[in-house]
């Protein structure tokens, strides 16, 4: 198959979620990407094009196919068999939204192949049904910062663009599976603790809306919902908090369920922080990312190229 045979491509940014106390509701797009190149074929087949996705299921047991099939079936449609080439630099099970990017891409795949004509709101709802919450999926679909609530019959979301920050990520080479990260959380919080946790979350959102990054950074490190319980799973967290804070970061938090740790810093200062953290954490990948304003992009083959 050559580029001339391609029907369309779908490019989706990765994401981070929570930012500390914005648990299961706050998400932000990040400049790591998943790209699907879709070709007509006589059967469903998925081909990995990068090491990150090497070993993914190659047939109809692939997550992308399963989500696309369920999305199309909701409208009584079937999907024509396709060859899907999968390129990605979003590491799996690291808290950078790899599954949400795949789910968002799958919803768009169904939308294109079955001509569903889904609205943005419908895409968000179907992706959130698969994910269980809208933070990562919303960020991948729409870019920028998103704050949302997902319920079985409806998904609400507010989004904001122009997030003028550098985001430095420290990515350990071990995985933290979402199930394991959920298992360490308490079944409940006491009423006073829940009130305090909610207040911290409210202040995080207020800071985000005002783009008061110093306030945001302080609230990121005051979370009471999940980070106190997950520290044992990510021993680097406390050390990165200290090192990043000593080098100008506004604040540091787990990215999603971890193990990736992210730090916010003033635009233009991220590379210096990246270099500093890379020297301190040689056993991790360290990168300086940005927050793209654009979410999912579909590029269709031009009629003129036929």
From Swiss-Prot:
Q: Which residues bind ATP?
A: 91-101
Reactions the enzyme catalyzes: L-homoserine + ATP = O-phospho-L-homoserine + ADP + H(+)
Q: Which UniProt keywords apply?
A: Amino-acid biosynthesis, ATP-binding, Cytoplasm, Kinase, Nucleotide-binding, Threonine biosynthesis, Transferase
Check the record and name the SUPFAM superfamilies matching this protein: GHMP Kinase, C-terminal domain, Ribosomal protein S5 domain 2-like
EC number(s) per entry: 2.7.1.39
The GO terms this record gives for MF are: ATP binding; homoserine kinase activity
Q: What class of enzyme is it?
A: transferase
- Superkingdom, taxonomy of origin: Bacteria
One GO CC annotation:
cytoplasm
PANTHER family, A to Z: HOMOSERINE KINASE, HOMOSERINE/4-DIPHOSPHOCYTIDYL-2-C-METHYL-D-ERYTHRITOL KINASE
Its annotated function is as follows: Catalyzes the ATP-dependent phosphorylation of L-homoserine to L-homoserine phosphate.
UniProt-listed HAMAP family: Homoser_kinase
What's the protein here called? Homoserine kinase
Q: What is the lineage of its organism?
A: Bacteria, Bacillati, Bacillota, Bacilli, Bacillales
